[in-house]
Amino acid sequence: MKKEILEVFDNTFPGRDYTIEIVNPEFTSVCPITALPDFGTIIIRYIPDKSCVELKSLKYYFLEFRNAGIFYENITNTILDDLTSVLQPREMTVITQWKARGGITETVSVTWPQKQ
């Protein structure tokens, strides 16, 4: 995915811890095994430091996954890695909730920094 698409703007309250939650209920990708579409919800929660992610750029970043054959776990970790490298937040959690396939749903979550 092209993390260069992601744009940021200055956090005007860097001295205060507050949480930003972003939800994308229409995320799509492709199963790398079956080539069938996968549908999910992406939830991003973060405490910004010096910058915040600009939402239009995030939308276009998400569209990069639309035709990519990629596993749920890889999507979740890639989003976290890309956003933390661009934003350098104080804390971030990415949760992906996937629609049922064969009657089974999956939720994947990852947090940065990792708890010791």
UniProtKB/Swiss-Prot annotation:
NCBIfam families per the UniProt record, alphabetical: QueF-II
Species of origin: Chlorobium phaeobacteroides (strain DSM 266 / SMG 266 / 2430)
Key words of the record: Cytoplasm, NADP, Oxidoreductase, Queuosine biosynthesis
GO molecular function: preQ1 synthase activity
Pathway(s) per entry: tRNA modification; tRNA-queuosine biosynthesis
GO (cellular component) term, any one: cytoplasm
This enzyme's EC code(s): 1.7.1.13
Reactions mediated catalytically: 7-aminomethyl-7-carbaguanine + 2 NADP(+) = 7-cyano-7-deazaguanine + 2 NADPH + 3 H(+)
Protein name: NADPH-dependent 7-cyano-7-deazaguanine reductase
Residues where substrate binds: 53-55, 72-73
Assigned protein family: Belongs to the GTP cyclohydrolase I family. QueF type 1 subfamily.
Compartments where found: Cytoplasm
Residues at the catalytic site: 31 (thioimide intermediate), 38 (proton donor)
PANTHER family associated with the record: NADPH-DEPENDENT 7-CYANO-7-DEAZAGUANINE REDUCTASE
Single Gene Ontology BP annotation: queuosine biosynthetic process
EC top class, as a word: oxidoreductase
Known function: Catalyzes the NADPH-dependent reduction of 7-cyano-7-deazaguanine (preQ0) to 7-aminomethyl-7-deazaguanine (preQ1).
